[in-house]
Each structure stands twice: as structure tokens, then as C-alpha cells.
Amino acid sequence: MQAPIGASRPQRVKQYIPSKPHKWGYKIRCLNSDDYLLHFEIYGFKEGAPSDAGATVDTVLRITAAYQQKQHVLYTDSWFTSPALLDALAQRGIRLCGSVRSNRKGMPAVAKEEVLALNRGEWLQRQKGDATVAVWRDQRCMWLLYNHCSPGESASLERWNDFGRKVSVGCPRAIRDYFYRARSVDVLSQLHYAYCCELTLETSVQVC
């Protein structure tokens, strides 16, 4: 997860993130489990020259260093997920499941025509080595890269239809796992912003 810590003083490592409630601040990259923050790293400090895998992969390997060779599953969003990250984590005993951008280098080939032909609740999967990419159609197509479970396993999710009712929609098991685990990131993000708001309200009170 990426989250900014609001800051007003000028600093070299401050970032501008227009999509976040706090536009200016220190960008931190977080590792969390079940709503609890395990480790974080402030973005902007140089850690030497990046490896061939790239700076993003290097960052993930640093913040997961204490959890290697324990067969944990790491869930990531499309900012971090890539075939290079999946391979690097697999070598260190960590499995990966994350949303991914369709144009990432090294992705298994998926024909555009096949993707466009999908209806809601349908999916297709392609494998390349240990990596599996799933393209699942809900209201729109979602791309997922994973190696933590078998590609043949299916499941279902409750989704809203056009009439405002919940319906059961079929999906690969990896998609269900990702949606379930992504909730902890959302909760941690909400707590983070609520805590920042409390600090702002508290420090704005003047005692006369």
C-alpha cells in the first residue's frame, strides 16, 4: 500500500499526490496484515543503484525481508505487481497475488479479441512458467497475476447488478482471495486518514 503522511514544511522527500485526501506529504510504502501495519519505508531516500529488476521490486524485497522463506502470500496492487516481482519473491519463498497492468513486461500473451468477448462472470487464464494471469469480467475487466493457488480452482463473489441487488458472480479462486485480502488495505487506509484528521483538528484548537 502507498499512503501519504501530511506535511506542510518544505522537505526534499515531500511528494504531491493529487488522488489522495492529503495532497502534499511524505509517501510511505507499507506492508500490512489484517489491518495492522508491519513495516513501512519512506519514499524518496536513495537506497543505492536499483537492480536489474527495478526500483519497485527492490522496495518490495526490502520491506518483506523479515518474512522470506516462510511461504507467505503477498497481495499487491497494480503499482507493484509484475512478472519480475513474482519471480523475485518466488526465489525467496513468498507467493504473490496482485492486480496487474496488462502491458507489464513479461506478461503471458492474451489476445485482445478474447478479452473483449468476455461476459460478466466469465474469465480466461494464461500461464507462463509458474505465473498465471487471469482476466475476469465484472462491470469491467480485471487483470490478476498470481502463483499462490491452482489456476483450475473457481469460486464466486457477491456483486451488485444493474437493479441494485446482490447477485452471485463466478470468478477464479485467486480473484476471490484478492478481494477478501484487499479489504485489510482499505481498512488500514481509512484508519490512517482518520488519524491524520484527528491530528489536524486537535492542533487547530487555540486556547485563549
Predicted regions and their residues:
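Acidic, contiguous segments within the catalytic cores of piggyBac-derived transposases
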Residues: 2-208
